[in-house]
Amino acid sequence: MAKLTMDEINSVKGKGFLRNRGTDLFSGRIVPVGTVFTAEQLHAVAELSEKFGNGKMMATSRQSIEVPGIAFENIPAAIEFAEAHDLHFGGTGAKVRPITACKGTTCVFGMYDTQALAKKIHETYYVGWSKVSLPHKFKISVGGCPNSCIKPSINDFGVEGNREGGKVVYKIYVGGTWGKSCRMGTPLSRKVEEEEILPILEKCMLWFRENGYAKERFGLTIDRVGFENLEAALASDDLLVRKEEILAAEIKQKP
């Protein structure tokens, strides 16, 4: 096969296939719904790896599974096989990334059903906003208690279950990052009720899209524009009212 072009490599990267270093083979990233794979799905992933990859599978830090060693020409068949088994490749690009959640659903320390909330966010924003471009990747994490095993404070948007006055409330972190540039997420000034989480998340992403520069992470936008500006925007529904206008606009370029 002729040497792959950058256009070909980038075209499949957007579908969840990352080139393996020094080869023309790819790792396909399979994203779970609500962080959970069924036994049947895992059997299918193993079969997919044997048919199209090198027989190996690796868990990612965002609770997805990567299947390495897939030849470029086999990617369409791998996608078709995956979809026939209720599996979906993805998890790349400047948009909402795969949602992560701790085992709060079953953990003795979990204060609420973390996987149910992760599934709701997955369906509403990972899937529902799959065509929405953001200034940079946007990582969301759902934690069941202050032990923070899933590290919500180092995600762009993190949820942490807390207990106050005999009921569960939610601490929200914004702007966290990890890696080359580390920034602890900034906690919102008040804890929120469960029904407030998704509207606040959507406002955060709309604010980020309107204020962020291309290739700028949410935390850097917060530092540049001001946390007080973000909190003021979250206190009203103006961003939701202007949602279509914000999503239709071009991403800002850094001056």
Segments and roles (model prediction):
Residues 10-17, 43-54, 171:
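Short amphipathic beta-strand starts and helix->beta connectors
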